[in-house]
């Protein structure tokens, strides 16, 4: 057990420091912005220091463990710990949240509340990734939803109330199943109810009961991921949310669903996952094709990017269901890769809207000439999204492909069919991605329009875009930097499917 509470400080610090925003002197929004950015930078530095000097990547066991008794009545503990599976998403959360606060610089209305909600969301996300107690995981999961709902309601577009209501109905409905699964696992199989994740992992369940638990957890995580047909909240939410909120949604929130599938459905319930994995493989394949085809028909720029996110999540589902080291490592790499790329695309879409005040692609065109920097950055991230070699998306999708081909669970003909359909999906990706760039930047619709508001990217936008682009290129050139974090943990998880 760790004697210095690194993880507790990392989880609590953002929301605690964020609550002090309301006590800052009224000296304009600039003080609040810089205060929030400093908190995020300090948190990211603290996290990086703790992981660099106190985390050993070659150890698959839980590290930096903290266990404090909280409520004696039903053995509820404040229990935190990290392993190779959670370190990547936690660092991604810190990086994207820091950049999202910088992206939110133009926000002036109710600035204190806005930045507090972003920091509260930060704590909830890190708490979810580091929880080793099932009920604590559920509490952190819910803590992260409330700020998103308020950010949507108060700083969204014209249809923000509809989108926020749809978001909360879907996610709250999924949370009911999550709570039922948590309580079911806690109450089964021991004289005293336990919420300890380590104890639950070593517990054996009857197959029927394990399937019931699996379905409950799967519904909760399928809403968040999202997995079709529980994805319809996502395009509406992205279409109305402020682009800094979209960065957090695409970069982190969707990845929480994928993390939950691996952490709970796969690690906690391996027998049920083995039964359901062929169906997950089919769903993931359909999702890639369906979302890519639907994205092509979207007029709204942000909705087109949202459907592209749904399509890319299909690769993660396929990697999780492949039951191979290679496939699962590819899924984890895709989680990190798409976290960067999705956040960047939504940021650039939002900053473009700030300049031209248009959101429909068929009304755009010809803005490459007055905004060459914006054109260059958007084109670069579009290339990353369509998995151009040398960028992180290419490596992640290629590893998922190898995971399916080398898997022993599936017969040769199904593997060939799935690979063929996935390849079709990869062909559709450049079609909708490149057509999006063509409609925005080429043509003549806005070519002769007054250029007063068509100012190009400033230092803030350039810094933010380059900060995201560097890890996309870095992971594409040297993916082992990310893969080495989780490779031992992946072997431990998959050993349950063959030796348990």
From Swiss-Prot:
It is an enzyme of class 7 (translocase). GO terms for cellular component: chloroplast thylakoid membrane. GO terms for biological process: ATP synthesis coupled electron transport; electron transport coupled proton transport. Keywords: Chloroplast, Membrane, NAD, NADP, Plastid, Plastoquinone, Quinone, Thylakoid, Translocase, Transmembrane, Transmembrane helix. The keyword Iron does not apply. The keyword Signal does not apply. The chain crosses the membrane at residues 4-24, 35-55, 87-107, 113-130, 134-154, 167-187, 208-228, 242-262, 272-292, 305-325, 330-350, 386-406, 411-431, 462-482. Signal peptide: none annotated. GO terms for molecular function: NADH dehydrogenase (ubiquinone) activity; ubiquinone binding. Pfam families: Proton_antipo_M (PF00361). Its EC number is 7.1.1.-. It is found in: Plastid, Chloroplast thylakoid membrane. Its main location: plastid. It catalyses: a plastoquinone + NADH + (n+1) H(+)(in) = a plastoquinol + NAD(+) + n H(+)(out); a plastoquinone + NADPH + (n+1) H(+)(in) = a plastoquinol + NADP(+) + n H(+)(out). It is a multi-pass membrane protein. Belongs to the complex I subunit 4 family. HAMAP family: NDH1_NuoM. This is NAD(P)H-quinone oxidoreductase chain 4, chloroplastic. It comes from Nicotiana tomentosiformis (Tobacco). The gene is ndhD.
């Amino acid at each position: 057990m760790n004697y210095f509470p690194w993880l507790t400080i990392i989880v609590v610090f953002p929301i605690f420091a964020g609550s002090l925003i309301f006590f800052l002197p009224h000296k304009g929004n600039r003080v609040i912005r810089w205060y929030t950015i400093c908190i995020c930078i300090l948190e990211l530095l603290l996290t990086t220091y703790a992981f660099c000097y106190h985390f050993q990547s070659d150890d698959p066991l839980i590290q930096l463990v903290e266990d404090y008794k909280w409520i004696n009545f039903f053995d509820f503990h404040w229990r935190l710990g990290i392993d190779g599976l959670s370190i990547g998403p936690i660092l991604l959360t810190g990086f994207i949240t820091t950049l999202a606060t910088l992206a939110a610089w133009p926000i002036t209305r109710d600035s204190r509340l806005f930045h507090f909600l972003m920091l509260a969301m930060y704590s909830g996300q890190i708490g979810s990734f580091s929880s080793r107690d099932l009920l604590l995981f559920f509490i952190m999961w819910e803590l992260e939803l409330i700020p998103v709902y308020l950010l949507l309601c108060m700083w969204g577009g014209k249809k923000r109330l509809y989108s926020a209501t749809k978001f909360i109905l879907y996610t709250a409905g999924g949370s009911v199943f999550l709570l039922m699964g948590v309580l079911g696992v806690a109450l089964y199989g021991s004289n005293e109810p336990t919420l300890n994740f380590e104890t639950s992992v070593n517990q054996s369940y009857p197959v029927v009961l394990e399937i019931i638990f699996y379905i409950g957890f799967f519904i909760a995580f399928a809403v968040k991921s999202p997995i079709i047909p529980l994805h319809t909240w996502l395009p509406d939410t992205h279409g109305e949310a402020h682009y800094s909120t979209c960065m957090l949604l695409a970069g982190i929130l969707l990845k929480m669903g994928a993390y939950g599938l691996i952490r709970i459905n796969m690690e906690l319930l391996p027998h049920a996952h083995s039964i359901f994995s062929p169906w997950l493989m089919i769903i993931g394949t359909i999702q890639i094709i369906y979302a890519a085809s639907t994205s092509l028909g979207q007029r709204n720029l942000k909705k087109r990017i949202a459907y592209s996110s749904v399509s890319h999540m299909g690769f993660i589902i396929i990697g999780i269901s492949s039951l191979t080291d290679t496939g699962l490592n590819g899924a984890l790499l895709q989680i990190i890769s798409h976290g960067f790329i999705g956040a960047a695309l939504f940021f650039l879409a939002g900053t473009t809207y700030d300049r031209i005040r248009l959101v429909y692609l068929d009304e755009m065109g010809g803005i490459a000439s007055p905004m060459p920097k914006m054109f260059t950055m958007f084109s670069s991230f579009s290339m990353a999204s369509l998995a151009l070699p040398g960028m992180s998306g290419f490596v992640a999708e290629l590893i998922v492909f190898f995971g399916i081909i080398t898997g022993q669970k599936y017969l040769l003909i199904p593997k060939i069919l799935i690979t063929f359909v996935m390849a079709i999906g990869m062909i559709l990706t450049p079609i909708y991605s490149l057509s999006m760039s063509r409609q925005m930047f080429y043509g003549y619709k806005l070519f002769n329009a007054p250029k007063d508001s068509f100012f190009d990217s400033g230092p803030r936008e350039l810094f933010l875009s380059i900060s995201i682009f560097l890890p996309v290129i870095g992971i594409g050139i040297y993916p082992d930097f990310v893969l080495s974090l989780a490779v031992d943990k992946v072997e431990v998880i998959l050993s349950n499917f063959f030796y348990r």
